Amino acid sequence: MSAVPFTRVLLISGFLAHLLLSTFVTLTVCKEVTEESDDLSKRNVLQRQLWAVGSLMGKKSLENTNRRSDEDMEISALFRGSPLKVKRSD
């Protein structure tokens, strides 16, 4: 029966100790992160802005729009050089 050198036993046991320690550290960090995200999700549900819900979205911006008259559109077409037909009274 051959004997295993003592340095090799220390090397293997040291590797296993580091592996166990790193596993423990990562598990505790992951658990803390998930606990914080659970608390944040509970808080965000209560801070919901009600003006941006469903059928109310965009209503504020549609009430105050100004419609341009036909005369204004003809004048702007002249300045832009648009190919729109413009009635001229001579």
Swiss-Prot record:
A Pfam family per the record: Bombesin
Question: For the modification Pyrrolidone carboxylic acid, which residues carry it?
Answer: 49
| Protein's UniProt keywords contain Oxidoreductase | no
Q: Where is the signal peptide?
A: 1-30
Q: Please give the tissue specificity annotation from the record for this chain.
A: Expressed by the skin glands.
Residue positions of the PTM Methionine amide? 57
What does the UniProt entry say about where the protein is found? Secreted
Question: Keyword annotations for this protein?
Answer: Amidation, Amphibian defense peptide, Cleavage on pair of basic residues, Pyrrolidone carboxylic acid, Secreted, Signal
Q: Which GO terms describe its cellular component?
A: extracellular region
User: What InterPro entries is this protein classified in?
Assistant: Bombesin (IPR000874)
**Propeptide boundaries:** 31-48, 61-90
Q: Which family does it belong to?
A: Belongs to the bombesin/neuromedin-B/ranatensin family.
Q: Tell me the protein's name.
A: [Leu8]-phyllolitorin
Q: What is the lineage of its organism?
A: Eukaryota, Metazoa, Chordata, Craniata, Vertebrata
